[in-house]
Amino acid sequence: QLWPRPHIPP
């Protein structure tokens, strides 16, 4: 990824 993305829980 080129920028921080919100982490989606599995």
From Swiss-Prot:
Keywords assigned: Hypotensive agent, Metalloenzyme inhibitor, Metalloprotease inhibitor, Protease inhibitor, Pyrrolidone carboxylic acid, Secreted
Tissue note: Expressed by the venom gland.
Keyword Secreted: yes
Signal peptide per UniProt: none
GO biological process, alphabetically ordered: regulation of blood pressure
Residue(s) carrying Pyrrolidone carboxylic acid: 1
Source taxon at top rank: Eukaryota
Keyword Secreted: yes
UniProt miscellaneous comment: Exists in two forms, due to cis-trans isomerization at Trp-3-Pro-4.
Family note: Belongs to the bradykinin-potentiating peptide family.
Function per UniProt: This peptide potentiates the effect of bradykinin on the isolated guinea-pig ileum, does not potentiate the effects of bradykinin upon blood pressure and inhibits the angiotensin-converting enzyme (ACE) from rat plasma.
Protein name as annotated: Bradykinin-potentiating peptide F
